[in-house]
Amino acid sequence: MSWLILLPLVFSASFVLTMVGLGGGLIFSPLFILLQFPVHTAVSASLFLNGVAALSAAITYFRKKMVDVKIGLPLIISSSLFAPLGAYTTSKVNLRLFTAILAAVILLAAARMIFSQKAESDTKEISTVHRIIGGGIIGMVIGFAAGLLGIGGGVFIVPLLIYVLKVPTRTAAATSIFIVVFSSFSGFMAHISIARPDWGFILLAALFSFAGGQLGSRVMAEKLKGRTIRRIFGAVLLVFALKLIQKVFL
């Protein structure tokens, strides 16, 4: 595939997914592998571009005061601690059954996000203690599931923040982006210790990823309502659930 096509795809993925609290990795990694990039190159490039898009969007969300750091920090810490536990447990559980259950839960969350007509208040208050404890517990769940399945945990953050902690959708998406910055770059550092990335490609692609993250975050912050964000994210969840189902049955 020509770079004239690939680089706009990087921009588009960053634009769409940063609006809903993700960085683009759901698209980058399978796209690069489909284009027959070496696996380590595909994964490291995906993580780096994911981090760049998330960092770009996080700048906007912090300026708009949309990030809830009191939830984000304990979530980052606890998910980092529990991801190795999930990886260690991989050989001790029935992964096919666990993945099937997870896919079913994600499908339900996707349906609720897409079809729910319930309005929300962007001014709903949550106690500081509730935020810290809830963020820590959610981080444990996300880290464990991510380590167990070998997938990024970002796709779980937004629905858990919305439906468990009752965080307004826009705040949940912005806080998720803040978390994705740390998880992406830490994963990238681990991968470059194994294999050298294609710096020429990822630095050029990073310009498009950064631009997409800027545009996506500005559109979300200034134009999109919570209900619209939930529906876009629900569509992303639906695609992710179908990928998990494919992993179970194929």
Locate predicted features.
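Transmembrane helix boundary and interhelical junction motifs in multipass membrane proteins
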Residues: 20-28, 150-160
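Residue positions within transmembrane alpha-helices of multi-pass solute transporters
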Residues: 23-24, 55, 81, 85, ...
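Residue-level recognition of specific faces of alpha-helices
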Residues: 18, 31, 51-54, 147, ...
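Early transmembrane hairpin of solute transport permeases
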Residues: 30, 34, 41-58
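Membrane-interface alpha-helices at helix entry/exit sites of multi-pass transporters
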Residues: 38-45, 70-71, 166-177
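Juxtamembrane transmembrane-helix boundary motif
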Residues: 1-18, 29-35, 39, 60-145, ...
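Membrane-helix boundary/interface segments in integral membrane proteins
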Residues: 187-192
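Transmembrane helix-bundle signature of multi-pass membrane transporters/permeases
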Residues: 43-51, 80, 173-181, 206, ...
